[in-house]
Amino acid sequence: MKTKVYLTWKQVENFVNIIKNKYILEEPFTGVYGLPRGGLILAVMLSHKLHIPLLAAPSDGCLIVDDICDSGESLLHYFQNSSGRSKKRYTLVTLVYKENLLNVVPDYYLIPETDDHWVVFPWE
């Protein structure tokens, strides 16, 4: 049985601040898009912190966020249009990353997940 690891709102807020401090100077994002449902809360938080629009659909140069990248399926399309090209279209960010068979790796993540634990987000 997997051990549950509970993230707090403070940890999520710290992550948002890390992203803000890391990327605000590096890349002028056109907006932030959150994958439904897990990425929406992070997208709203980042939209406020970065003072950029919350997008209803992703656009070139935007930040794409999700709560977790585990199977890689939800981020696969964006990953193929991000890291695999010389001109980067998207920056992918998740709270949690787990190695997956699709080899999808976000540009930035906070927690590497292992097979022996399960992350529970504060909004769950």
Features from the language model and the residues they span:
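PRPP-associated nucleotide enzymes
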Residues: M1-E124
